[in-house]
Every structure is written in C-alpha cells, then in structure tokens.
A protein has these predicted regions:
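Conserved AAA+/SF3 P-loop NTPase catalytic/coupling segment centered on the Walker-B
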Residues: 10, 31-32, 58-85, 117-125, ...
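Conserved AAA+ ATPase "SRH/arginine-finger" region at the nucleotide-binding site
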Residues: 24-27, 129-139
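Short glycine-/polar-rich loops that comprise or flank the Walker A/P-loop
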Residues: 19-21, 61-62, 87-89, 103-105, ...
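Conserved Walker
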Residues: 2, 45-56, 70, 87-103, ...
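Structural recognition of the conserved hydrophobic beta-strand(s) that form the central parallel beta-sheet
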Residues: 25, 65-68, 83, 92-93, ...
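Walker A/P-loop
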Residues: 1-28
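Basic, amphipathic alpha-helical bundle interface domains used for macromolecular binding and assembly
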Residues: 136-137, 142-187
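Short glycine-rich substrate-engagement loop in P-loop NTPases that contacts/grips substrate
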Residues: 28-60
Length: 187
C-alpha cells in the first residue's frame, strides 16, 4: 500500500495477537553476516576459538520476521530468507564454520508500490498478499494517527486501553489456528 496506510502499525500489531511471539525487524541495510550469522569475533579474539554467532534469521525462529519495504531489500537476500523459511533450515558455511539451524518464522513484508514492486515469482512465495488502500475520510485518518501516536508515547497504557479488544481478537485467531488442520481445499 501507499505511504500513510499504516502498514507498519498493522505489522507490529500482529505480534500482540500472536501469543507472545516477538516481532523482529529486518533492516534494509542488513548484511549477510547480520542475517545468516557469522563468527563471534569477540569470542575468537579472547579465547582463540571459532564460534558461530546466530543472525537475525536464527533469532526469528518461532517469532515474526518483519521486512518493511521488502521491494527495496536486495533481492538475493529476500530470496534467501524465503528459501530458508520454506526449507525450514538455514545452512551456514563461511569462514571455516559449518552450522545448521531450524527456521520457523512467520514472515510479514510490506512494500510501497510507488517505489517499485516485487517480481511475480517472489510474490507467489508469500502465503497472502493484501493490497492496502489509502483511507480518504479525514476522521478515519485522524483516528489512525491518534492511535499510532498514543502507542509511541506509552506502549503499556496503549495495551491496557485496548486489552479487551486485543484478547478477543487473539482468541478468535487461536480458534482459527486450531481449525486450520481440518481445512481442505476443494478442487
């Protein structure tokens, strides 16, 4: 969706509804070492031994990995994240270290089509695509801005204020997750 459609706010709210899972943000300037992991330099210098230091992908396991402006991320890194998440494993072979760890993350990505789009073969790898339209009603836009500001001013107060609504929605999502294994796609 376009700028100002609260895509980032919506993505952050997913963590609140996901039963204690954390939201980790993948920065656009991420390096391969930051993403996949690398040698723990401090450990190597102080003890003279090589040790693997997990990257963002390892920390995102059992959590939510958020990519804001995914269309601006280097495409080879985005493809590698999608590959690892699809395979359920990240294999790291670098600097004399061989490491393998599980990857089980919920991936949420946003993009502003004004700044370019993702190729269809990349979009196809996401489970769902939602086109967010900009709100034109002034009252709705004001409400979104007020809530975003309230959240940034005092997160705990914001959570208390909307706790009942959040709990109700989280319960609905939990019930839907329970039903999901019983869902069969028709021909």
């Amino acid at each position: 969706g376009a700028k100002g459609t609260a895509k980032s706010v919506l993505a952050r709210s997913c963590a609140e509804l996901a039963g204690g899972r954390r939201l980790l943000t993948l920065p656009l300037n991420v390096t391969e070492d930051m993403l996949f992991g690398s040698i723990d330099i401090e450990y190597a210098v102080s003890l003279g031994e090589k040790r693997f230091s997990p990257g963002i992908l390892a920390r995102a396991t059992d959590n939510i990995l958020y990519i804001d402006e995914a269309n601006l991320l280097r495409q080879e890194l985005l493809t590698a994240v999608l590959d690892a998440n699809s395979a359920g494993v990240n294999n790291v072979e670098r600097d004399g270290i061989s490491c393998r760890h599980a990857v089980r993350t919920t991936l949420i990505a946003t993009m502003n089509p004004e700044e370019g789009t993702l190729p269809p073969h990349i979009l196809d790898r996401f489970g769902m695509y939602v086109d967010v339209q900009a709100l034109t009603a002034v009252q709705e836009r004001v409400e979104i801005m007020q809530r975003a500001l309230a959240y940034s001013r005092n997160i705990l107060d914001f959570r208390r204020r909307y706790a009942e609504e959040t709990q109700q929605l989280a319960a609905k999502l939990a019930a839907a997750r329970e039903l999901l294994p019983q869902v069969a796609a028709s021909d």
